[in-house]
């Protein structure tokens, strides 16, 4: 398929001006002297081009999307209708509180709902993504220890953690210290004890962790950290597994971020938008970003008066459109959020049990909402996890997350979510088993994959080292 520049012809899609108008409000040295170099196509051809591109995209509405740790669940379309209501769509952030009471009410009630599901005492909706929530949480940790006169420098992070955890800690001014996993894929308690000293500010954990395994010693970890004067940070990337069964507060965490674009069904991918609200226990509430939304019994307000606030972490009030969608999802599901987690865990275990004889399971424990396979057995035959991921594309299935977590060789992280029915799960199982068989009997078809995708084999090394990121039209 040609790119839009290659489709350019002598037809003008739009006439800007005849070139005689003078632009006297911009210094002449900043004005373009040559041609703009934009493609010239008709409106119809532009529409056709981008429609053809959209047809090549893969999305949850098009097929199975088992992208581990991303929770690619179905996003109900009624949420889109609600987010596009005129009263939400056309309001301006500079309007006074009395003019946006409906929007503030929604945000306040979303804060309250997130307090219920997490057990936290106070919530901010500002952060725009999970990693942004992590950074916000780490800034709160930093400000807390500054307020009590302690200059702690270390944050402990499990070796199975998301890569954003050490990055967020570093950005907030901490040094990350890795704690190893044990033979069950959980935090090694003895290794953790050896790392604890008065320079440790916090531990960042995901529970269930990125192996899809529940950290069964979390209460002991909480006790150890608190006895050391340290805080516990909960990465909510895998929160879809535990709703209604437990919450971060019960596990002993002090700070939590949630990914509304994962657990609470708002569309994501392609860089955003997202939302990563942060909740804290009572002793940390004054460190939250401002404003937080409050209710005095009659009216809703934006409260900027938090004594030790870390300040503003996002323009205005967060990604409001995402907040609307998430609140709608919570209202729709209600107490059935617990069933969401039950179904997500059931679906993951169903697939895992059917694939355990065809692929290596590095940690053969009952999993939660996702699990990790290893392609080590297939690698011995010359077929890598990357090869198998590309072969999945020939069956209109999005590849799972691969080569993560880093502690698993040839990793494939599979998360079906609660959205998929048994027929779809069986289809995926059959395709994976077929690929395992092809490794033995017909490896060439895997090595040539994807065979049905619009873009076939690419030179990944060349693309990484010499990316061609723009197009220069000929004069």
Where are each of the predicted segments found?
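Conserved PLP-enzyme active-site core in the AAT-like
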Residues: 102-105, 132-298, 308, 382-383, ...
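Conserved phosphate/anionic-ligand binding catalytic regions in large, soluble enzymes, centered on
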Residues: 58-79, 126-134, 264-279, 317-328, ...
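General small-molecule cofactor/ligand-binding pocket signal
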Residues: 124, 177-179, 400
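Short amphipathic alpha-helical face segments that pack within enzyme cores
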Residues: 109, 135-136, 140, 321-325, ...
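Acidic/His-rich catalytic or pseudo-catalytic neighborhoods
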Residues: 209, 314-317
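Non-catalytic terminal extensions of PLP-dependent enzymes
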Residues: 1-122, 246, 296, 302-313, ...
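Short, flexible loop/turn elements at secondary-structure junctions
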Residues: 71, 129, 209, 238, ...
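A short, small-residue-rich loop immediately preceding and capping a beta-strand
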Residues: 121-127, 154-157
